[in-house]
Amino acid sequence: TVYWSFVVTATSLGDPLVGRVLDGRYEILSRLARGGMATVYRAHDRRLTRTVAVKVMHDGLGDDAEFARKFDREARCAATLSNPHVVSVFDQGVDDGRPYIVMEFVTGCTLRHIITREAPIPPLRALEMMESVASALSSAHEAGLVHRDVKPENVLISERGQVKVADFGLARAVSNHTATATQGLLIGTVSYLPPELLTTGRAQTWSDVYSTGIMLFEMLTGTKPYTGEPPITVAYKHVNEDVPLPSEVLARKHPGQARRDPIPDYVDALVTACTRR
């Protein structure tokens, strides 16, 4: 497994960027993952002869000069972060009208993969991983940077077990370019969306704390606190309902594990504190 996803050669077939060299330096080797705003590639840095991850924004986002300036500013800010639990940003630029950002290539898997395979995760192990996430977010917040899109897909676990948070700086640039949540567009993954991003369209440092609390809840219980269709239903619950205690959800859905490895009261209290509206 590699940065953000498994390498599947078939996903690279027909991708026009595979085989290209961005700015005469970054040779695109294969596609790793595709999201709503960008595609992530494995690439070779010809200048420093190393493997990197390159995130290329989709066509159209680079046409707006204001977005290009914000993207550049946010990428530069993210590049200043120095923390072992932050995926390092090496470079950024624009190639053929498409903004891109060059990042550390992490061999491993995402927290989403861990949750899918192992959840409910024992409390001590979950807390150990969340401590690393908190360290990364703390460094960002001290630098004045809010992540805005904390979710399991943006948390990487290396082959050595090191936890790293990816995508600092990108969510803000994209969301500022498109629209605020109050204008009808749900920025970020709705399952982890902080209430204030929905009600005011603005994210603060505690917005990342809220999303981290939701992520910890899912790790502990194997389920998200709010589900439903359409996504606006889940968004409404984030704004109007309190997150249930993880211990109660675990006891109801996985009674055997709740007896073998119960969630302590202080962990319940931590989730409640993180997700307080």
Predicted regions and their residues:
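Activation-segment/catalytic-loop signature of the eukaryotic protein kinase fold
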Residues: 92
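Activation segment signature within eukaryotic-like protein kinase domains
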Residues: 129-130
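AlphaC helix of the eukaryotic protein kinase fold
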Residues: 56-80
